[in-house]
């Protein structure tokens, strides 16, 4: 569950501008503020089921956006490559060819 929450938070960060205000509000309250479905329903004066349905549809939309735009995947790959590059730089013996390959891989992501 924590892994899903983390993923949804990342997807929300990347794609929230593509969502409606209501979708942003529900997702923010549910995932960022950790409110329950019932608490969100009470705040918006709708049923718990309406909140649940909206959040599930929004989650599916975020996954669809990621499938098409792969912003999160590229971000994670960049993070991995930057960490590897930092490790290589910090080592006593610099492996120039390997560092060049990492830099090229980062450049290809953008």
From Swiss-Prot:
Domain of life, source organism: Bacteria
Annotated Gene3D superfamilies: Winged helix-like DNA-binding domain superfamily/Winged helix DNA-binding domain
Disulfide bonds: none
Transmembrane segments: none
Protein function: Might take part in the signal recognition particle (SRP) pathway. This is inferred from the conservation of its genetic proximity to ftsY/ffh. May be a regulatory protein.
Family: Belongs to the UPF0122 family.
Annotated NCBIfam families: PRK00118.1-4, PRK00118.1-6, YlxM
Name the UniProt record assigns to this protein: UPF0122 protein BC_3844
């Amino acid at each position: 569950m924590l892994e899903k929450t983390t993923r949804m938070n990342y997807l929300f960060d990347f794609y929230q501008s593509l969502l409606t205000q209501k979708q942003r509000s529900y997702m923010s309250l549910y995932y960022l503020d950790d409110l329950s479905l019932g608490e969100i329903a009470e705040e918006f004066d709708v049923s718990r089921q309406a909140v649940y349905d909206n959040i599930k549809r929004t989650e599916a939309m975020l996954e669809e956006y990621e499938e098409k735009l792969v912003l999160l995947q590229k971000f994670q790959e960049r993070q991995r490559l930057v960490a590897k590059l930092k490790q290589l730089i910090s080592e006593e013996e610099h492996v120039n060819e390997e560092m060049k390959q990492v830099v090229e891989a980062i450049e290809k992501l953008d």
